[in-house]
Amino acid sequence: MVAARTASLSSQKIISEAKPNLTDLRSFIEKVRQEFPEDVLTISKEVDPRFEITALVAKLEQERRFPILIFENVKGTKFPVVTNVHASRRRLAAAIGSEPRSAVASYLKRIEHLIAPQEVATGPVKEVILKGDQVDLRAIPQIVHHQDDAGPYLTAAVTLARDPVSGRLNCSFNRLMSIDRNHTSIHLTLAKHLWEFYTNAEKLKQPLEVAVILGAHPAWSLGALNIGSIDEEEFYLMGALAGEAMEVVPAETMDLKVPARAEIILEGEILPFERVDEGPFGEFTGYSLGSRKREVFHVKAISHRKDALLHDIAVGHLDHLLLSTIPMEANLFRAVKAMVPSVKAVRIPAPFTVYVSIEKKTEGQGKNAILAVLGADLYMKHVIVVDHDIDIFNDQRVQWAVGTRCQADRDVVIISNVGGSDLDPSDLKDGVTAKMGIDATAKPRLDSFTPRHRVPKDVLDNLDLKDFIPASWLAQKDRKS
């Protein structure tokens, strides 16, 4: 597979040897605890997995606090739960050795230097192995996140599968709804890679073997969300993002390699021609989507650490919303750069929405950037492009640019009946949507647009607030911010 991988990604360097590591979820949490001690909170009081875990996340969000939460005592199970791991851009950036503002650049730089996985004989995830009648998913924490959810869900499930036609590997996030001791539903996003693998398997009248990873280093999460060619095998991306080779071990029941230092692995198959009612479920959009027919996952084996943690994602909260931003922004930055080389930054501020900052050299580049975004990611349906003098991390400044540099009849692009997300509650039918782009750049260019009013730079630079305002007032203002 390494040779095939090299051929399909000739522009990227593959490192086949790397130093053995301890790159796992626990080591990441410990790293966060050491560097940002306020970012890890352990709760020893018993918590009910039905609503209380999400309620605690929501209560802390109301206080503008987003720590990793470790629940040591979860009602009805021996397994602790960890959630809110991704609820900080600072933590996600730290997972790839970066600062928050440079996370996209660091992501793109790292995935240019791929690191092959390192196969080992065994690992912590093999400490307990359950097969056949020993399998009981009900022993795992049964977390119900929102009041309208149809039942318990596994929301941090990273699915690993091999295409039965091409032999290519893929990792992706797929939610699982508990059905019984050895079955769940599985949500396959329309037209994505795992959906295509499963479609190929159904055409062959066979199940699709998959392994589901529950609890691994955030590099697995970020790599699983990478948007790339179907020829890419994300194992190499995981190592690149972590900066170390990922240790893998053979699965118990299939010809797949799984992360040796995961917390829990589910092995099984997505059954052909079988569907089950799934949902309602509260999604990342903030809405509870209704019941739909979904595929069925039959679990044949579970392996886990003796003291395994169940990784949960607080659906629809910051933990969920931030996770996809860095890989999606990186993909969009790369796509826009191919069309507009002077792109400066990309930001996803809300579901289905993206801001793009460019240094416009010629008229028309604003709309070129819009088309590049809409063609690069099915999920994106609203694009706002601004000049490089606008801070796209400041929503107010972006809206100021829309209000002062845009004319709707000239600068708004609307495309009807195109492929989008089947999780969008506003679409008319599964995955079909309308998309809009707003070119909020100055016309024809920033340097020839109506000048902005400014306080002279030398006056701003030389003025010190402490010379005019009491220190006690300044300190009070700092405490409130």
Give residue ranges: language-model regions.
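Extended, highly charged
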Residues: 2-296, 300-480
